[in-house]
């Protein structure tokens, strides 16, 4: 009987299916650690951390402050929680931004590399046998945002730092321009594609007016074509996401031209791309990419940050978060996402970190899985008047930082339009429908 089941399992795996009751595959997503090595408790709250830029740290404690980037103790607590969570994961994705938010003169190339090295060694010490797929963030360079289109000291340094995780082909393209792809060990026909979307980021002056910086679009198309031919599935990871900012009107996370190109490519290869995973925003958000006819074809997940930092002018921020995805090991369909968080106020009061489950996406929202159709149906529920589902979503957007937070009509329209519309034409139409506004 066991032999027959094993044979059936093997046959189903070849067909991209899994046996009922087979354990789900799992991977962790961590992002935006933003270590501030200067963080320390002192009576002068303007001097607690360089990342507060002289502002008074509001309530500094052992695990940090909302006006500061992450102290090392907070980052250690996150990885310690993951290590002792009891969740057996086959890999981790780490989507960038290790250095703190400080003025350019306070850092250097050496300082940036040192912080990335520190975080790399920290991860390796907690998880010596875990496969990790890293990607670079806009702060993982000096000066920040200015990631180049050719070999650089930082690209070389991270390739050396990440040798234990990446194969020679991946390291070669990483050295050239900060992107790579690699198959996932133990997961037949699953490939990670790590994009350097910092090349498309508005503040990056290096790539201004370039149609295909570092030939990354050409490389991405070739990589996805090859995966299609080889019947692979792809998990796409990057730092800066595609789509529109959910708290702004008509602003894309990357330059609009690059966003349109990326969206077109991701539509064309939606049968290959089984999921997209981003950081950068420090908030917890979803997006659903639809094809030209409005059919949902791709699920996107923006993970909240480990750092709790906010700008002195902002009212809200995020509690620190890390997340775990579950997937079908046969066809790489995403089954669920478990978001974990640390209540920073509580941790500082008690002097100990108690990371806990914030929510399971399927259980909280009553959806069957994380496929595009499921998330599209959920987004439709969000859009209904007085949606209790959306109230939950908006609280989770800030990782349960402030349950009294209210999203008014315009705020909600911007959120809904950003979740469901990733290209200019559909986003503009959504704003027109909800707010009577059209954007260029």
Label each residue range with its predicted role.
Residues 71-136:
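Long, well-ordered early-domain segments
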Residues 112-126, 153-172, 259-267:
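Acidic, His- and aromatic-enriched active-site or binding-groove loops in soluble protein domains
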Residues 96-121, 141-159, 246-251, 286-292:
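Metal-dependent catalytic neighborhoods of phosphoester/phosphodiester hydrolases
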Residues 19-94, 154-230, 283-440:
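Metal-dependent phosphoesterase/phosphodiesterase active-site architecture
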Residues 202-217, 225-278:
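Active-site-proximal segments of metal-dependent phosphoesterases and phosphodiesterases across multiple
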Residues 36-39, 100-103, 134-145, 201-203, ...:
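Active-site environment of divalent metal-dependent phosphoester hydrolases
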């Amino acid at each position: 009987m066991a032999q027959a089941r094993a044979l059936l399992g093997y046959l189903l795996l070849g067909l991209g299916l899994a046996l009922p009751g087979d354990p789900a595959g799992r991977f962790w997503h961590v992002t935006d650690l933003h270590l501030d090595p200067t963080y320390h408790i002192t009576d002068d709250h303007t001097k607690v951390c360089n990342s507060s830029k002289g502002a008074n740290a509001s309530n500094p404690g052992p695990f940090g402050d909302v006006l500061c980037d992450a102290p090392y103790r907070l980052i250690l607590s996150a990885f310690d929680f993951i290590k002792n969570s009891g969740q057996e994961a086959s890999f981790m994705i780490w989507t960038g931004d290790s250095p703190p938010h400080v003025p350019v003169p306070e850092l250097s190339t050496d300082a940036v590399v040192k912080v990335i090295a520190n975080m790399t060694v920290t991860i390796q010490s907690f998880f010596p046998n875990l496969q990790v797929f890293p990607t670079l963030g806009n702060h993982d360079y000096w000066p920040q945002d200015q990631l180049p289109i050719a070999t650089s000291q930082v690209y070389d340094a991270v390739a050396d730092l990440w040798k234990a995780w990446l194969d020679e082909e991946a390291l070669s393209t990483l050295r050239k321009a900060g992107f790579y792809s690699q198959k996932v060990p133990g997961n037949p026909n699953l490939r990670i594609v790590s994009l350097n979307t910092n090349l498309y980021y508005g503040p990056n002056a290096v790539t201004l007016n370039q149609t295909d910086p570092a030939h990354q679009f050409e490389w991405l198309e070739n990589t996805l074509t090859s995966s299609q031919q080889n019947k692979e599935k792809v998990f796409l990871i990057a730092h800066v996401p595609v789509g529109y900012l959910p708290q702004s009107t008509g602003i894309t996370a990357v330059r609009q031209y690059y966003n349109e190109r990326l969206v077109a490519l991701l539509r064309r290869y939606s049968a290959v791309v089984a999921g997209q995973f981003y950081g950068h925003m420090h908030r917890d958000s979803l997006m659903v990419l639809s094809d030209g006819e409005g059919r949902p074809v791709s699920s996107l997940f923006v993970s909240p940050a480990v750092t709790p930092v906010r700008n002195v002018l902002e009212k809200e921020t995020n509690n620190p978060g890390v997340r775990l995805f579950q997937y079908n090991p046969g066809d790489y369909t995403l089954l669920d996402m478990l978001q974990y968080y640390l209540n920073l106020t509580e941790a500082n009061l008690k002097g100990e970190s108690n990371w806990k489950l914030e929510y399971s996406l399927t259980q909280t929202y009553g959806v069957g899985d994380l496929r595009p159709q499921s998330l599209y149906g959920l987004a439709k529920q969000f859009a209904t008047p007085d949606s209790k589902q959306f109230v939950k979503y908006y609280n989770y957007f800030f990782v349960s930082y402030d349950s009294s937070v209210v999203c008014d009509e315009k705020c909600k329209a911007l959120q809904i339009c950003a979740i469901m519309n990733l290209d200019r034409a559909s986003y503009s139409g959504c704003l027109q429908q909800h707010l009577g506004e059209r954007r260029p």
